[in-house]
Design a protein with these regions (language model features):
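Catalytic helix-loop patch of NAD(P)-dependent Rossmann-fold dehydrogenases
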Residues: 71-74, 78, 82, 105-172, ...
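NAD(P)H-binding glycine-rich loop region in Rossmannoid oxidoreductase-like domains
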Residues: 38-81, 92
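A conserved pocket-lining segment of Rossmann-fold NAD(P)-dependent short-chain dehydrogenase/reductase
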Residues: 125-129, 169-171, 175-177, 184-209
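Glycine/proline-rich active-site loop of Rossmann-fold NAD(P)-dependent oxidoreductases
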Residues: 112, 140, 152, 158-168, ...
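Rossmann-fold cofactor-recognition segment
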Residues: 28-40
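Mid/C-terminal beta-alpha module of Rossmann-like enzyme folds, strongest
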Residues: 14, 213-269, 273, 298
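Amphipathic terminal alpha-helices
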Residues: 290-306
Length: 306
C-alpha cells in the first residue's frame, strides 16, 4: 500500500493516474494537513492505511509562477521544508520507505568544471548561496531537512552535497515539467502564453516519464538517495519554440528579452533558475528516460488543448 501525499497537484495527479493504471493500491493524504497537524495523527493515518511506502508530491510552487512565493512565504516554507521533515521523522519511526519530489531549481548557471549539475553537488541557487528565489531557497532547505548538507571537497572544487549518515529515502529532482496536455502548470503552455520569452538552456522533465521513472526506482529497489529525474539532454528556449512551430501547435511570432537583465527589469520579481542537470546516476541505476527532444516532439505532436 502506497501513501500518496499531494495527489491533487500537477505532479501528484500524474502519480495517481500511474498507480491507478498499474492497479497499485494507494491511499491519498493531504500535505497541508500533515504539515499543520499532529505527528500522531499522521502516524495513525499511515498505520490505518497499512502503508508500506510513501510518495510525497506535495509542495508549494506559487501561482502562476514562483514570484507568488515571495508574497506567501509562510505557506511556501511549510510545504517545501517543514513537510519533508515531518515525513522523514514519522516514516522513520514506522520504518516506512519514502520518496520525496524535490526540484532541480536549486541550481543556476553552469557547473564549475563543466557538465551538468550532479546529485553530489551542493546547491548554488539557495539561501546559503544567494541570490535565489524564495521558492528555490525552500526546496534546497527541504533537502537539508532530509539530512543533506554541504561538505568541502578541497582543491578548489565546488562543495559536495552529502547525507549526514546514509540516505533514508528517495529525493527525486523534477525540472520544468511538461506533457501533451494544455495546463497552466505545463511548461509548453507557459511558453505559448508569455508575451516575451527569456532565452535560456535547461533540463526538462516530461511529466509521465518523470512519475514512471520515480515509480521504477521503487519497483527496482534502486539505492536510496538523490536522483536528477530529467529527460536526457538539454534544450534552449529557441529550440522549444521551433518545435512548437514545426508541429503546428502555435505559429505566432515569439518575442524574446534582450538578456536576463532585461527580463528581470520588465517581467520578474525574483531571480529564476536556469540550469542543466546530469541525469547519468538515474541511467546507471537502470532507469531509462527518453531524450528530451524526443519527449518534447511527442508531446507537441499529441498536443491537446484545454
Amino acid at each position: 500500500m502506497i501513501a500518496l501525499v499531494g495527489s491533487t497537484g500537477y505532479v501528484g495527479s500524474a502519480f495517481r493516474q500511474l498507480l491507478e493504471s498499474k492497479g497499485v493500491a494507494f491511499k491519498t493524504l493531504s500535505g497541508r494537513q500533515i504539515a499543520n497537524g499532529s505527528k500522531k495523527d499522521f502516524a495513525d493515518a499511515l498505520k490505518d492505511a497499512g502503508a508500506t511506502f510513501l510518495v510525497n508530491c506535495a509542495g508549494y510552487t506559487g501561482k502562476p509562477n514562483v514570484d507568488a512565493c515571495e508574497l506567501d512565504k509562510g505557506n511556501c516554507l511549510d510545504g517545501n521544508a517543514v513537510l519533508p521533515g515531518v515525513i522523514r521523522e514519522v516514516c522513520g519511526d514506522l520504518s516506512i520507505g519514502w520518496g520525496h519530489v524535490s526540484s532541480g531549481c536549486i541550481f543556476g548557471g553552469e557547473r564549475p568544471g563543466g557538465g551538468g549539475w550532479r546529485e553530489d553537488d551542493a546547491p548554488n541557487f539557495s539561501f546559503r548561496k544567494p541570490p535565489c528565489s524564495f521558492y528555490s531557497g525552500t526546496k534546497a532547505l527541504g533537502e537539508e531537512v532530509l539530512g543533506y548538507k554541504e561538505a568541502e571537497r578541497g582543491d578548489g572544487q565546488w562543495p559536495a552535497w552529502e547525507h549526514e549518515s546514509s540516505p533514508e529515502g528517495y529525493v527525486w529532482r523534477l525540472r520544468i515539467p511538461f506533457n501533451h496536455l494544455d495546463n497552466p502548470r505545463n511548461y509548453l503552455t507557459k511558453v505559448q502564453s508569455y508575451a516575451t520569452l527569456l532565452q535560456a538552456t535547461n533540463s526538462l522533465s516530461q511529466l509521465e516519464d518523470f512519475v514512471a521513472a520515480c515509480y521504477e526506482c521503487v519497483e527496482k529497489q534502486v539505492p536510496y538517495g538523490i536522483y536528477n529525474v530529467t529527460n536526457p539532454g538539454a534544450v534552449t528556449t529557441s529550440q522549444v519554440v521551433d518545435l512548437i512551430k514545426k508541429t503546428g501547435v502555435n505559429g505566432k511570432e515569439f518575442q524574446f528579452f534582450e538578456d536576463e537583465a532585461d527580463f528581470m527589469s520588465k517581467a520578474a520579481k525574483t531571480p529564476r533558475s536556469n540550469c542543466v542537470l546530469d541525469e547519468s546516476k538515474l541511467r546507471d541505476a537502470g532507469v531509462i528516460m527518453r531524450p528530451v527532444e524526443e519527449a518534447l516532439e511527442w508531446s507537441l505532436k499529441n498536443w491537446r488543448k484545454a
